[in-house]
Amino acid sequence: MNAMETEKQGTSGQSRIAVVTGAGSGIGRAVAVELLRAGWSVALAGRRPGTLEETAALVPGSVCLTVRTDVSRPDDVAGLFAAAVERFGRVDLLFNNAGTFGPGGVPVEELEYEAWRHVVDTNLNGAFLCAQAAYRQMKQQDPQGGRIINNGSISAHTPRPHSVAYTATKHALTGLTKSLSLDGRPYNIAVGQIDIGNAATDMTARMQTGALQANGEIAPEPVMDVADVARTVRHMAELPLEANVQFATVLATAMPYVGRG
């Protein structure tokens, strides 16, 4: 883990403070940019420092911190939150976004254990480590409290073919969200989850040319603008702490979801 501050003036010291994981690309980048444009100060976390700097450069005049972080490593996560608190003094929001689909299209009987473990370490263990670190900080800071938004998936509801590791971790993330939400109540910590379907990112680019369907066919699927996801996350983030979107589902209108199994 290492941190580098992107020095940009234009956001006051009273700005709300967010930590966004997986901020170097895709949904994480879109959400980070949306928050920065809205005046939040943001700690941008991800495995590739170069892409984090690219995210920061998209919003001139913002205040942000880039922190190289592998969320599956406890020391990296501890360092991320230490860097954020040292720079900004508190954490008001965690967008718990870092994740991986893993090896797509691999039948369960052929899935290597190491591939399974990598998905679990990133999607579930990483989400837990980040939520735990945020929870500890939000509980002890003054004023107490904050918000955690977990990035679930449509796969938290229904699977795609040959996606056992991804689907299992996203179902588990829903349990994590519910438990954190219950345990956070006494400390003014609101916890919610956004389940996203087919936002246009590098991860979903293949869906526009063809994705495996439950009937065995390969068919293209519609996608939606990732900026619409970012605006939804910002809405959830900016609610007062006495209000919480527990679960939100945002998907491309025509994608196969209802009845896809």
Named regions from a protein language model:
Residues 24-26:
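Conserved glycine-rich cofactor-binding loop
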Residues 131, 169:
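Active-site helix of classical SDR
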Residues 153:
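Residue(s) in the substrate-gating loop at a strand-loop-helix junction
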Residues 193-194, 212-259:
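C-terminal helical subdomain
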